[in-house]
């Protein structure tokens, strides 16, 4: 478990499923991610992937909740999704974050991602990447605040996306 001033990051549990499902089925939340709300089955598969990442890679996604009242904020973490993307990213951990609509605009994404990155830095991971839809200005700002810089563009699912990279702080 990781704690910040306002947040608690922990591995997803079965009890997180309903909150995760509600968030990923919200069209406003997924607008710049896939553009298509997730079904209950797709959210279930996501929860299984999140847990499986930890066993296979030693890192993965955390469930983010507020410390004050335990309210579900969203998901943040890292994966090797083996994306069909040009240029390929090999096995570099890819950061990702998504927040429930109520949590937008409160600095939670930056706070959670900074904590997750500190965890990765502590494990000696030299660099991470993230991909962001060019029109998603909010996520671009979060990435910049967390030390990501524009590496270039990439083609993912036939669309151009921004490819950002971050180097470990203590190198």
Spell out what each predicted region is.
Residues 1-32, 48, 63-171:
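Acyl-donor (CoA/ACP) binding surface of acyl/acetyltransferases
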Residues 35:
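Active-site beta->alpha N-cap acidic-glycine motif
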Residues 38:
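Donor nucleotide-sugar recognition loop
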Residues 51-63:
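A short helix-loop-beta-strand connector motif used in the catalytic cores of GNAT acetyltransferases and
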């Amino acid at each position: 478990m990781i704690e910040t001033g306002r947040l608690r990051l922990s591995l997803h549990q079965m009890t997180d499923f309903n909150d995760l499902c509600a968030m990923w089925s919200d069209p406003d939340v997924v607008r710049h991610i896939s553009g298509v709300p997730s079904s209950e089955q797709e959210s279930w598969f996501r929860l299984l992937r999140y847990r499986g990442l930890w066993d296979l890679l030693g890192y993965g996604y955390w469930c983010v909740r507020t410390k004050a009242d335990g309210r579900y904020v969203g998901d943040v973490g890292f994966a090797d999704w083996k994306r069909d993307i040009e240029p390929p990213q090999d096995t570099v951990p890819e950061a990702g974050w998504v927040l429930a609509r109520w949590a937008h605009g409160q600095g939670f994404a930056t706070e959670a991602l900074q904590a997750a990155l500190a965890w990765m830095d502590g494990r000696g991971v030299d660099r991470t990447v993230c991909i962001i839809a060019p029109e998603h200005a909010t996520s671009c700002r979060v990435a910049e605040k967390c030390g990501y810089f524009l590496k270039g563009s990439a083609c993912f699912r036939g669309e151009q996306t921004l490819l950002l990279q971050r180097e470990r702080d203590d190198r």
